From Swiss-Prot:
Chain's role: Shows cytolytic activity on many different cells by forming pore in lipid membranes. In vivo, increases heart rate or kills the animal by cardiac arrest. In addition, it binds to heparin with high affinity, interacts with Kv channel-interacting protein 1 (KCNIP1) in a calcium-independent manner, and binds to integrin alpha-V/beta-3 (ITGAV/ITGB3) with moderate affinity.
Organism: Naja atra (Chinese cobra)
Name recorded for this polypeptide: Cytotoxin 5
GO CC annotations, alphabetized: extracellular region; membrane; other organism cell membrane
Principal localisation: secreted
Length: 81
């Protein structure tokens, strides 16, 4: 009985995500990835000339500054990019 209880506890810990992990969309929003530790922002990168089509999406630790050619949009909730 103790073994069964211990097994259930271990399975619960493995199945539940005890630490917070962020999920960010990949280039195609149907797919996402779980961000590694330390990367706590999702980002979407656009070319300034065409803001409708994102060039890149993913996980990042610090939101980069926008430039004359590239614009970044960062957020910190699951699949927000």
């Amino acid at each position: 009985m103790k073994t069964l209880l211990l097994t259930l506890v271990v399975v619960t810990i493995v199945c539940l995500d005890l630490g917070y992990t962020l999920k960010c969309n990949k280039l195609v929003p149907l797919f996402y990835k779980t961000c590694p530790a330390g990367k706590n922002l999702c980002y979407k990168m656009f070319m300034v000339s065409n803001k409708m089509v994102p060039v890149k999406r993913g996980c990042i630790d610090v939101c980069p500054k926008n430039s004359a050619l590239v614009k970044y949009v960062c957020c910190n909730t699951d699949r927000c990019n």
